[in-house]
Amino acid sequence: MLNVLIGLHDTLQIRLEGGDGSVLFSMKGRGSSEIPNDKGNLCVQAAIRLIERTQRNDVNILIELDKRIPAGGGFGGGSSNAAAVLSAVHEALGQPLDEVELAKLALSIGADVPYFLRGASQVCVGGIGEQLHIDRSSSLRSTPVFLILGLPHLGTPVVFQEAGYSTRMENSVKKPTNSFPEEYGLLLSLIQNDLEIAASSLCGLLKETLAALRALNCGRVGMTGSGSGVFILPNDQTGFHIEDVEKLEEYCLSHALELVKSSII
């Protein structure tokens, strides 16, 4: 599996102060009213587990989150925020854990957290998220990408269950591919998402949207993560043609979806 970073992001403000090991969390922004603000939030989990692992009950961690990444879209918002909390708080505590210990802690929070903790863009991921190999090819760097937001929320465990997988996938662990082709067209031809069929069966609107966008032939259309977000890469790596952008804008406008332009970092 190839994971890449894009320009869409949330904003975190994190402070440490003397205390009793409490985690104080607040959130605003996109969809914040629908996202857990207790231990069900990966940011809170990351802070609590780091306090427990380092036995630092003499500090409180204050976290403020401004959401821009839609929840339940498969964009890794929760996992990337958890990784950011781990990294920032761990550094503020004087880096008491070594790299391996911190990576294990990250994996205990979520399968995608180690990837975001690593901080590299193009990474081939295998196992249950612990096998990471940086892909140093330039296949996708700086490539523009369109994101389709506004489709119904899909929970990762539900999609995995529909696909017949455990979310931990102990019985289907695969070694990561060490690299992907540098030729852009060949790379596009290899892009697929094994969870798309399951996610589409749970969300008819996702299935309809993917089919309609592919019929427009404006680029390579795929589903992000476990859904329900959709991405479109240009047929030509130099960028999207004006007529393709107009088609995408018209489709999203007529279907009450949000079209966001970003790029791969």
How does the language model describe each region?
Residues E64-L93, A111, R220-P234:
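Glycine/serine-rich anion-binding loops at beta->alpha junctions
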Residues V59, A82, L86-Q131:
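Contiguous, small/hydrophobic- and glycine-enriched helical/loop subdomains that border
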Residues E52-L62, A88-L107, D236-Y251:
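Phosphate-handling active-site elements
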Residues D20-P36, V85, L107, E183-Q192:
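Short, basic/glycine-rich phosphate-binding loops at helix/coil junctions
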Residues M1-G73, E91-V100, L149:
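ATP-binding N-lobe of GHMP and related small-molecule kinases
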Residues F25, I61-L65, V221, S254, ...:
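Generic structural signal for residues in well-ordered beta-strands
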Residues L12-I14, C43, G78, L147-I148, ...:
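Residue-level signal for inorganic ion chemistry
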Residues F116-R118, V123-R220, N235-I265:
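Conserved, helical-rich catalytic subdomain that frames metal- and/or nucleotide-binding sites
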